[in-house]
């Protein structure tokens, strides 16, 4: 080392590299409302307005999709939010003695 002219003992150079953590976006989940023969259409619209903050026109469109196709998409959310909304709708329907069902699936 005595022959190395580029080596400096007194040099206190510190290199700091900053890395930004790579965070993944959360997996989106669709909340689906399922058709049944007993829940009134008005109640379905009420649920869509109340729990998914839809206006009357959007809620009616989704309700008709549920009625005609058997299933309708209420929205796309993170898993925790989707699960909460499903539980809210099902609990609200039970309280009002309706068999309305919601489920979630990966978007």
Curated annotation (Swiss-Prot):
* SUPFAM superfamilies, per the entry: ClpS-like
Where does this protein have compositionally biased stretches of type Basic and acidic residues? 1-12
Q: Where is this region: Disordered?
A: 1-21
| Gene Ontology annotations of biological process type | protein catabolic process; proteolysis
UniProt-listed InterPro entries? ClpS, ClpS_core, Ribosomal_bL12_C/ClpS-like
UniProt superkingdom: Bacteria
**Signal peptide residue numbers:** none
Which family does this protein fall into? Belongs to the ClpS family.
Function recorded in the entry:
Involved in the modulation of the specificity of the ClpAP-mediated ATP-dependent protein degradation.
Report quaternary structure and partners.
Binds to the N-terminal domain of the chaperone ClpA.
What is this protein identified as? ATP-dependent Clp protease adapter protein ClpS
Species the sequence originates in: Zymomonas mobilis subsp. mobilis (strain ATCC 31821 / ZM4 / CP4)
